[in-house]
Structure formats: structure tokens, C-alpha cells
Amino acid sequence: RNRCSISPVEVILLSGVRNNISHSYLKKQLCDLLNVECLPPDYYAIFKSVTRFSYAEMNDLLDYYKLEKNKNGQKQLNQRGKLLDTKTIRAWKKVFKKNPNLPEAEGVPQGSPISAVLANVYMLKADKQIYEYVSALQGFYMRYSDDFMVVIPNAAPVDFRKHYETICGFITEAGGIEIKAEKTRIFFVENGVIRNCIADVIFSQENGKDLIDFLGFSFDGKEIRLREKTISKYYNRMHRKAVTIFKCSGVTKKGNRINANELYKKYSYKGSAAYQNRKAAINGGKHIEGNLFDYLKASKRIIGDNFVDSITPRHMARIRRFINGKQGKHHK
């Protein structure tokens, strides 16, 4: 939160890719967590269900429902509440395929509710090793899924490679996780000045921007903002929504009416939970989940004065300008 001005700091950002995680290693981590020699029957049943999985190809599902093999077909498929009932699954067994890595005892399907939990269990030993290593250096360690951040104070550039290789060693020791060199970033921060120095550690890489990007935020040594990619995505989606509204003259293919209110609801503060729930309390309506502006508000509250919100101050004017421009073209 505060400017890095006391001592030089090394910041290591790593991004891993889970290839085929080892079933035996995962089972050992579960046993260590539970402090048991063998998994209890209920735990083993869950473990077995996610390691001996079957799956169906998207194209086979599209064929079954007679849908087009494109994004539109996939969208229609996703709109179904339940893809296959038990009776259909039993009759359709030949379409399902077994885990292709089962002979090697590797791989866990992504997307199931338990997958994220097991992924964290898988990393328990590595997390402990990295935490202890970094703590001994009075540093800071954070991991979110496969994205890692390590901050080491009083760091000497001569030690950067040693820190990097040690931490990568802890991660890859588990097996099944590959550290992508092209996604690795190493920075030297001193007196609020950030210097990208990845080329000094991984000779095959070139130094990039002197900007620390992590979990959707960017830090330039003084201020924290949303990443440019996040901001661009927000404006692009807003523009596409506006174009859609005016292209179809405010009526969907199904005959439902849409207007600019939908645009404001999704892409302005008027759609935020804080704004809508305040109206709901007055009008007796139901509460809603909110949008990006709730995220911005929470970011400001948590990060403090160092957080710069570049969207909120000008977004309403930008929406109005875009709508007025489209309306003018629409009526010509």
C-alpha cells in the first residue's frame, strides 16, 4: 500500500501451468493434511471420482442436441439447465471417454467444485516451503491459483537468480506444474522506482515494462490502478452492447424490447449493487449482485489513497457521448 522507499525490494511474479498433476502426490498431500496413513472411505470416494473421470467431446454433445458446431451452438448448449439426465447417460455410454492419462495416474478435470480445493491441497508442501524461505528473508509470499508473487526486501541483484531458482524448485518438485519463463517477471524496486530486470535472471527473456501487474491490478511504484487490459475490456464490451441495442432498433430476435437502461445497468454506477440496493430498500425491490463499480469501490476502500480509479469519473459522459453518436447515425 505504501511507496517502496525504505529499502531495495525484489519482486518475483510467476505464472504456472498445470499439465498433469500426479495422483499419488495429491493423495499423499491429502493424507498429510488429515494426518492419516490412508484416506478415509468418504475422502477416497471423492478422490476416486475426480481422478477416474470420464468426459464427452463438445462436438458430440452438439450433435446429440442437433446444434451447430460453432459459438452460437455452444451458447445454446450452455443455456440448458442440465445437459444429460441419468437415463440418457447410461444409454449414451459409448460417447464418453476415460481420462486419457489414467495409465500414468495423472490429471484432474478443471471446473468441478472440488477441483480448486484439490489444487490448493496439491500445493500445500510447496506453499509451506516457499513461505518459510521467504519469511526467513523477512519477505512476503502470495499465491492465487497458479499465479505466484514473492517480495524480498533488502535484496541484492546478485542474489536474484538464486531466489528465483530456489522458488521454482519448490514449485516444480511436486510435478505437473510448469513455470512459464515468458510469463515470469522480476523487478527491482527502490525509492518508488520500478525496474524490470528479468533479462538479468533469465537470459532468453527481454526486459518488459517497468510496471508490476498482478491479479488485475498494476503498480507503477506510486499508484495502483486496474490493468489496462481490464479497462479496455470494459469499454469494448460497453461499445458492443450499445451497437447491439441500436443495430436491432431496440428489439431482440425473440421480440423482447431493450433500451439504453440495459447499458447503464451493466456498464455504469447505476447498475452497482450499492446504487441498486439503495433503490431497492426504498422501493421494496429485490437486491442485485452489482457490476464493475462495486469492485472499484471495494478496491478504493481496501487499497486506500494509492488506488487510482480512472473509469468512474468519466464513464457516464463517455456512455452518453457514445449513445448520442449512435442515435444520430441511426436516425440518418
Report residues per predicted region.
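Well-ordered mid-protein domain cores that form the structural environment of catalytic cofactors
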Residues: 1-7
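Conserved polymerase palm-domain catalytic core
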Residues: 7-145, 149-165, 209
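Right-hand nucleic-acid polymerase module
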Residues: 37, 86-112, 121-124, 128, ...
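Conserved catalytic core of nucleotide polymerization and phosphodiester-bond processing enzymes
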Residues: 172
